[in-house]
């Protein structure tokens, strides 16, 4: 009888252990294989981690969306939401019990003590260097340097292929990118998030008006009346997701100004989504590259 009891208890313990192991497997970024349990307080750092195959245990969400960015959401199904980057949910962060917290220097502010009281805190200046530099820095922290180098190598190779496809469509034409919101019309500058992928990675030539924009600002608000002055051969268009922005673009398309644009007449207007194109991260840029490849392969 005692033997049966012992055997029964042993089986129970084994079953519980197996369940525990399964739960650990399903928990994102638990401390295994030397990878710390990470809380990311930047959507861009989160997406850099995803590019390295690491799903953070917790992450902030997009401020406007109040959710993970659409192109990353599926990969973050087991990641705990920690509020928005500008105002993280400290209670959720504390409950997460991370091993390390990744913060964006610009959003974190000067007082890092509240984070350091919870866990070791790593600060990243996302205004310094490129997404490649950010990826490499993160890779050092998580022992994924080889993976980062390979990711960048693959990206650069694909960028060359897409660049060739674009050349066949646009030739030596000059390009600009605009964004339509409910209240504004914006022209993107050479600065991130849009500038680097269009004018550096994909080698497109910006119109003269874009070159003259303030390089410290990501965009400049303009009136639709000055659109013809840019004289673009091709235009990339981002329209905000809300209904008012969508309606604003439909109204713009009906105007004589829009219909008279060189790019419109040449049928070289290319609609692109805000995400992943405006997510200046390793993951965002790669997905934008994939979209460009599909767009210009048609």
What residues fall within each predicted segment?
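C-terminal motif of bacterial Sec signal peptides marking the signal peptidase cleavage site
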Residues: 15-18
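Bacterial signal peptide processing site
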Residues: 20-23
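Basic- and aromatic-lined ligand-binding clefts that recognize polyanionic substrates
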Residues: 37-49, 150-207
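A short, structured surface patch at a secondary-structure boundary
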Residues: 43-92
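Extracytoplasmic ligand-binding site segments that recognize negatively charged/polar headgroups
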Residues: 68, 126-137, 173-197, 214, ...
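Proline-aspartate-enriched helix->loop->beta-strand connector
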Residues: 97-102, 120, 227, 231-235
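Extracytoplasmic substrate-binding proteins
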Residues: 114-183, 268, 279-298
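Structured C-terminal subdomain patch of bacterial secreted/periplasmic proteins
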Residues: 233-298
């Amino acid at each position: 009888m005692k033997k049966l009891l012992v055997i029964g208890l042993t089986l129970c313990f084994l079953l519980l252990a197996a369940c525990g192991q399964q739960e650990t497997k399903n928990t994102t970024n638990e401390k295994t294989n030397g990878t710390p349990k990470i809380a990311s307080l930047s959507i861009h750092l989160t997406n850099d981690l995803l590019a390295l195959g690491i799903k953070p245990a917790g992450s902030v969400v997009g401020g406007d969306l109040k959710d993970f960015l659409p192109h990353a959401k599926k990969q973050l199904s087991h990641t705990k939401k920690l509020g928005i980057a500008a105002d993280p949910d400290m209670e959720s962060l504390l409950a997460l019990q991370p091993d390390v917290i990744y913060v964006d220097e610009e959003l974190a502010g000067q007082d890092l003590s509240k984070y350091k009281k919870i866990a070791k805190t790593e600060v990243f200046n996302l205004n310094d260097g490129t997404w490649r530099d950010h990826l490499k820095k993160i890779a050092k922290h998580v022992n994924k340097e080889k993976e980062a180098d390979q990711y960048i190598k693959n990206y650069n190779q694909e960028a060359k292929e897409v660049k060739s496809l674009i050349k066949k469509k646009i030739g030596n034409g000059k390009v600009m990118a605009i964004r339509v919101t409910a209240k504004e019309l914006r022209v993107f500058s050479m600065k991130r998030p849009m500038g680097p992928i269009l004018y550096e990675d994909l080698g497109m030539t910006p119109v003269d008006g874009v070159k003259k924009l303030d390089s410290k600002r990501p965009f400049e608000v303009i009136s639709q009346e000055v659109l013809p002055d840019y004289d673009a051969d091709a235009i990339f268009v981002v329209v905000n997701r809300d209904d008012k922005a969508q309606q604003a673009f439909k109204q713009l398309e009906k105007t004589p100004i829009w219909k008279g644009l060189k790019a419109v007449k040449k049928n070289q207007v290319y609609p692109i989504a805000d995400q992943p194109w405006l997510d200046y991260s390793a993951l965002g840029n790669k997905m934008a590259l994939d979209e460009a490849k599909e767009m210009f392969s048609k």
